[in-house]
Amino acid sequence: GMLNLANAQRYGRMGEYREDNTAILTNPCGEISLADKETCNLSEIFPTRCYGPEEFFNAIRYATLYSSTVALLPTHRRETNNIIMKNRRIGVSISGIAQWASGFNKEGWSKNMNYSEISKYLDSGYKIVRSENKRLARDAGVPESIRVTTIKPSGTISLLAGVTPGIHFPVSRYAIRRIRVGTQSPIIDALLNSNVPNEDDQFSANTKVFEFIIDHGPVRPCEEVSPWEQFALIRMVQKYWADNSVSATVYFDKESCKPEEIQKMLDLYIPELKSVSMLPHSGHGYAQAPYEPLTEEEYNKRVEETKIDFSNTKGNVPSGSVYCTGDNCVRV
């Protein structure tokens, strides 16, 4: 992985000088530059779940309202509050970009969606975030946010929306998605009784790794998207949308993509990015990897074999009155 701290401190969107000298590192996934003791404040929107541009732009307004409001809330630590009050940093993110570019969209979007069209929507969307954040900051009597947009990896949240994670292309249309579930979770019995394939987590005690199946729809898998195109897409999004960073992993074929070619990519794109990592499609050696390709036949077979029944699963666990009784409150 690579972090270009100079770019993170010097630029908002690439090419727009907007100083952020307090930033000294990023969060673990690399999408948000942070000062010492500063916190992340993220929200997320899904263009392929919107019925056209107007709904997309409205979703941007709501996400900006949410994050800008959260930026007003104090934490339990004075040093953190001080840097939050100074920067008011937020990160409105987008997921499902691969599906968006593939035309896998609801009615209201252009049938001929492409990167050029997306760049226009990103640029217009960014201006809405900036305008809304400035208005909200003025109404609250605080400085506008030093940074407002990002692309987070969204490996988990994207599953809830049924979209591809962040800027990433899927490993294949049909795939296994491995998810870690604690053995004390309310859903563990339903999963075990439904014969969802699972094994003990190799890295965490009292945790199971379950294999769920996904159909990403008619979108290109990362094996069909060259690393050059992936780098170019990251650069485009860093230029037109993200004034924080873009959290992205560029996938490549380690057999056909030689070290000299990878070096050329890094030499060309590192000066124009804030963060990026690279990983081979397969043979990477990571146990219990989040994604694994499936054939359509394997996918259909698992659909027939697995029927999960959550009807007896409770989402709440009663714990009594642990907060306030009369004039006395429990601090938790």
Give residue spans per PLM region.
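Internal maturation/activation junctions in enzymes
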Residues: A71-R78, G96, A101-P153
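Short linear clamp-binding motif
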Residues: C329
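Catalytic-loop motifs flanking and including active-site residues across diverse enzymes
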Residues: E38, S93-G96
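Catalytic alpha/beta core of large soluble enzyme barrels
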Residues: G1-L5, R13-E54, I60-H76, K86, ...
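Alpha-helix capping and helix-loop boundary segments enriched in small/acidic/polar residues
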Residues: D20, S33, E54-E55, T80-R89, ...
